[in-house]
Amino acid sequence: MSMTEQEARAWIEGRVPRGTMAGLEKLVAMILDEMPRQNLIAASTAESIWTRHIVDSAQLVPMVGKGGPLRWIDLGSGAGFPGMVVALMLPELRMTLVESRRKRIDFLRFMAESLGIADRVTVAGQRLEMLESSPHDVISARAFAPLDRLLPLAHRFSHDATLWLLPKGRSAASELEAVTTSWQGDFRVVPSMTDPEAAIIVASQVQPRGKGQKGRR
């Protein structure tokens, strides 16, 4: 299915408290205000930011089971999608945003401070390869790298129960097929709410083949 901007805002408003909605509106305003200075999102998507970026990020939240505080790492956060949106929607969350471009690092930190969530949102301003290994409960990556590059890079940030949420375009099925000989786990391809040609790879128990039998596609 696809959404209009009005439908996207209504979808969010029906799922978050008023204060969270205000935070998301402020996030949108800050990103649009910054656009003349750096290309945070494609100019062609600015008029559909609620559909293409806010709801596209927020649709990941219901995929995470309810429980205690989560440690979430978002790879290649860019303008803060999905990581900053998720952090606003889940106040118990501890979020790490990984971004290597200096102007975007500074902007992500500015947004976290301005939104009042800097105490639980860490911006790791370096390349993923240089980041110290640590286990996280959720790993997300939106337009960061193809799956055959992403899994080897990011696996050291997972544990046995880590949930992987990987928004993809029309390449989701082919990217998944490309890793079946080298990786095992429970993999699903879930249609995106915001683009009929896009999908989300949802995975758990992800392991290199030969490193244990924790599930199969």
UniProtKB/Swiss-Prot annotation:
Q: Which family does it belong to?
A: Belongs to the methyltransferase superfamily. RNA methyltransferase RsmG family.
Q: What name is this protein filed under?
A: Ribosomal RNA small subunit methyltransferase G
Where found? Cytoplasm
Q: State the GO CC annotations.
A: cytosol
- Does the keyword rRNA processing feature in the UniProt annotation? yes
Q: Which gene encodes it?
A: rsmG
Source domain of life is: Bacteria
The function of this protein is:
Specifically methylates the N7 position of guanine in position 527 of 16S rRNA.
Keyword Lyase annotated: no
Give the EC number: 2.1.1.170
Alphabetical list of InterPro entries matching this protein: rRNA_ssu_MeTfrase_G (IPR003682), SAM-dependent_MTases_sf (IPR029063)
